[in-house]
Amino acid sequence: MAAATSTMSLLPPITQQQRWHAADSLVVLASRCHNSRRRRRCRYVVPRARLFGPAIFEASKLKVLFLGVDEEKHQHPGKLPRTYTLTHSDVTARLTLAVSHTINRAQLQGWYNKLQRDEVVAEWKKVQGHMSLHVHCHISGGHVLLDLIAGLRYYIFRKELPVVLKAFVHGDGNLFSRHPELEEATVWVYFHSNLPRFNRVECWGPLRDAGAPPEEDDAVAAAAAEEAAAEQMPAAGEWPRRCPGQCDCCFPPYSLIPWPHQHDVAAADGQPQQ
C-alpha cells in the first residue's frame, strides 16, 4: 500500500467540517451523513482516483495472529487494551494482521519494512464512554524516497483503507460477533507526514460504513463539492477528548500510538491537552 500527487476528500452531500491550524500543519476533517435510512459514510472519490481500480478485500489472503490475546474470551477493548498491526507483502499480496495488547513491533522489523513503511496500526479507545477506533498510516518522513512520493502514498492509503478496516473486522471476527456494537464505533484516521499537506486527521464515521467502498456515481459530486469547500473557511471539527481527571469512562489511560501533533488539536479547540 503506498504513489501522482492526487488526493481524495471526505465530502458529505450536505456539510463538511474542517479545521486548519498552525500553518496547515494539521487538518481535522469530520463528516456525518444525515440520511438515517442508509447511514452510509459520505465519502466521495475524484475521477482521477480510479486510476488503480477498486480495492477489494480477499479473506483468503489474510493471516491473523493473536499475540497475548485470548481469542475465545473476547475481552471488550473498553476494558483491556486491543491493537491491530497490519502489514502487506508485495511479493505474495498477502496481509498479516496481529491482534495484541500493543503494537507488534517485531512485525515491522527488517530493511524492507523500514523502507516501505506500508504498515497500518490501530488501537481501540473509550473516551467518555464512547468507543472509537484510531488508525495510523505513515505517509512520509524518515526517508527521502517517501517524501518524493508522499502524494501517491496518501492516495493509496486512503484508497486501501476500506480493505484495511474490513481486515480488522474479519480477522477479529469473534470480538465483533460478541460485541456487534463496535461496528458503530467512530473511525479516526491519522496520516503521519513531515509535509503539512498530508499531515492530517480524518473522521471516517462509523466502522460499519467506513469499510464500504465508494459508490460509482460519487465522482462528479466529489469534484464539485471539493471545489466549493475550498472557497470557504470550514468550521471546527469534533475531537474525542478524555476527561480531565481519573475516571471509568475513558480507557486506556494513555495512547499506545502517540499522535505527535495532539497539542495542535488541543490548541485549535482552545482546550488543554490530555
UniProtKB/Swiss-Prot annotation:
Q: Please give a single GO biological process term from the UniProt record.
A: chlorophyll catabolic process
Observed phenotype of the null mutant: Stay-green phenotype during dark-induced senescence.
Q: Where's it mainly located?
A: plastid
Q: Which UniProt keywords apply?
A: Chloroplast, Membrane, Plastid, Transit peptide
One Gene Ontology cellular component term attached to this UniProt record is: chloroplast stroma
**What is the tissue specificity?**
Expressed in leaves, roots and developing seeds.
Question: What InterPro entries does its record include?
Answer: Staygreen (IPR024438), TonB_box_CS (IPR010916)
Where, if anywhere, are coiled coils annotated? none
Q: Where is the transit peptide?
A: 1-48
Report the subcellular localization.
Answer: Plastid, Chloroplast membrane; Plastid, Chloroplast stroma
The record's family statement is: Belongs to the staygreen family.
Q: How does it assemble?
A: Interacts with LHCII complex.
- What is this protein's name? Protein STAY-GREEN, chloroplastic
